[in-house]
Amino acid sequence: MNYQIKRNTEETQLNISLANNGTQSHINTGVGFLDHMLTLFTFHSGLTLSIEATGDTYVDDHHITEDIGIVIGQLLLELVKTQQSFTRYGCSYVPMDETLARTVVDISGRPYFSFNSKLSAQKVGTFDTELVEEFFRALVINARLTVHIDLLRGGNTHHEIEAIFKSFARALKISLAQNEDGRIPSSKGVIE
């Protein structure tokens, strides 16, 4: 199933669709580094994204990065609501040379976000690295997930951020995998 949201504000214009089918993604945010990270996210999560985005990047990349996180989170929430069953929990460690990142995901219906990741530099190219946390916070809260992201070892900032995106993607893929018994993985019988 394909989920789509068009979101237009005074700051950004977004047309984003998401599918859980692992086909080729098309990502055009106008922010090269973010495009790169989202491409890695789709590859390692098995999700397909189509993103056409424009915005006030002449100011900086904050609005477009955060708004894309918001919409991807909303799309993930729709995916989870319609999925017959899922594993719920996922954890992934991802090394990238000297860097090691860990992400733990719970599709809980209770939004909580912990980002214990001191990045080594304030910029990668022109991209403000503080936006990594803003992107994931927006995604997690809007998807109603519990997520803990920890950068355990670092060095090169590009490697740090890449390991974070990949570890999140792989943990999410595990948590979205179909549950073997076909039931909702909650003693309540429901995740809201």
From Swiss-Prot:
InterPro entries per UniProt: IGPD_sf (IPR038494), ImidazoleglycerolP_deHydtase (IPR000807), ImidazoleglycerP_deHydtase_CS (IPR020565), Ribosomal_Su5_D2-typ_SF (IPR020568)
Keyword check for Amino-acid biosynthesis: yes
Pathway(s) the chain acts in: Amino-acid biosynthesis; L-histidine biosynthesis; L-histidine from 5-phospho-alpha-D-ribose 1-diphosphate: step 6/9
Catalytic activity reported: D-erythro-1-(imidazol-4-yl)glycerol 3-phosphate = 3-(imidazol-4-yl)-2-oxopropyl phosphate + H2O
Key words, A-Z: Amino-acid biosynthesis, Cytoplasm, Histidine biosynthesis, Lyase
GO biological process, one term: L-histidine biosynthetic process
GO cellular component: cytoplasm
One Pfam family per UniProt: IGPD
GO MF annotations, alphabetized: imidazoleglycerol-phosphate dehydratase activity
EC assignment: 4.2.1.19
Compartments, record wording: Cytoplasm
Primary location recorded for the protein, binned into one broad class: cytoplasm
Superkingdom per UniProt: Bacteria
HAMAP family (alphabetical): HisB (MF_00076)
Name listed for the protein in its UniProt record: Imidazoleglycerol-phosphate dehydratase
Lineage per the UniProt record: Bacteria, Bacillati, Bacillota, Bacilli, Bacillales
